[in-house]
């Protein structure tokens, strides 16, 4: 079968994925027409370095400080009897799911074009 892309639920998987691609002879460099596209999620300093090194095409940045702040805000809201309203928010959106409301914070796709942007949380550490 033809493999064109891999999504990793964490950048921590990239080293193992890249090793298996090499073993299978599918380790063409990022950007090469024969390359398997590799995308992950987290946006950690290590993930950004993988992009700089050409070992990962992209990652979705999940700013830990924003997640922690929003979690604290929502805990305070709910503990005081408030409810989480569905709909668009300045920093994302709240959608309804079978298990309750889900707050989806805005996320940035990081590629070689913006990997060094100072606004990325991992570049601020």
Regions found by a protein language model. Give the residues of each.
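Hydrophobic alpha-helical
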Residues: 1-50
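A general structural signal for well-ordered secondary-structure junctions
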Residues: 2-3, 27, 56-57, 85, ...
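Extracellular/periplasmic ligand-binding modules, especially the Venus flytrap/periplasmic-binding
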Residues: 5, 9-21, 52, 58, ...
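Short glycine-centered helix-capping/turn motifs at secondary-structure transition points
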Residues: 25-28, 54, 118-119, 123
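A generic structural signal for alpha->beta connector loops
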Residues: 35, 55-56, 106
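Flexible, solvent-exposed loop/hinge segments that line or gate ligand/substrate-binding clefts
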Residues: 42-43, 62, 109
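Short, solvent-exposed coil/turn elements at secondary-structure transition points
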Residues: 44, 65, 113-115
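Hinge/cleft segment of the Venus flytrap/periplasmic-binding protein
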Residues: 69-125
